[in-house]
Amino acid sequence: APFQSVYTGIAQTVKRAIDIDSIKRIKDLDLSLYPHLSYARDIFLLSLGLRGMSFIDMAYLTYDNLQGGHLTYYRRKTGGRLDIRWEQQMQTIIDKYPKDTKYLLPILTNEADDRQTYKKLSKRINRHLRLVGEMAQLSIPLTLYVARHSWASIAKQKQIPISVISDALGHDSEKTTLIYLSTLDT
């Protein structure tokens, strides 16, 4: 077919998600002897709590984004604005890390930190998450993408409106979101 290679905006690959039980197993792991794994888990859980927020968006979050019990930010990829209620469990994660930059998380130290820094860190976190996933006896490799897919999957199960899921994922249409949800495998 002549249009076989035309990209329609969403790759039709199976997107793997994990259920609430698996998330609980990840949370319950004792990682006190493995700070690097604990950090990777924190990033994963925070992404999950922040509606599957991407690693790059998390990297650029600052204290200015937090106001009146809400986190408000603009997605780097789409410019879409998101407003998420800030929960105690998110604060607990943030409080573990030093406050020596304007950023909420110890990912970037300044604006000049380039894509390479973020890419390298993202790779390392995914490598560590795979180990966390194995320790939690997950049936799939744990990655940052799994947080995004799992949030969407759980939101769908809880019958959260498609429009809300669509906004959170930064999709430009609900049709895109419906296609995305149909590719989720839990």
What are these regions (language model features)?
Residues P2-F55:
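Basic, Lys/Arg- and aromatic-enriched nucleic-acid-binding interface segment
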Residues P2-S5, L50, Y60-K96:
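Conserved tyrosine-mediated DNA breakage-rejoining catalytic core shared by Y-recombinases
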Residues G9, A17, R75-G79, L169-T186:
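Catalytic-site neighborhood detector that most strongly recognizes the C-terminal catalytic loop/helix
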Residues A17-K24, E87-S139:
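Active-site/catalytic core of tyrosine-dependent DNA strand-transfer enzymes
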Residues D28-P35, N126-D167:
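Short, basic (Lys/Arg/His-rich) helix/loop patches that form interaction surfaces
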Residues L31-Y34, T72-L82, A112-L121, I140-T143:
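Short, contiguous acidic/charged loop-to-helix segments that flank catalytic cores in large enzymes
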Residues I56-D57, V164:
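Acidic donor-binding helix in nucleotide-sugar-dependent glycosyltransferases
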Residues D64-T72, L138-I140, I160-I179:
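Short, polar N-cap/turn motifs at the start of nucleic acid-interacting alpha helices
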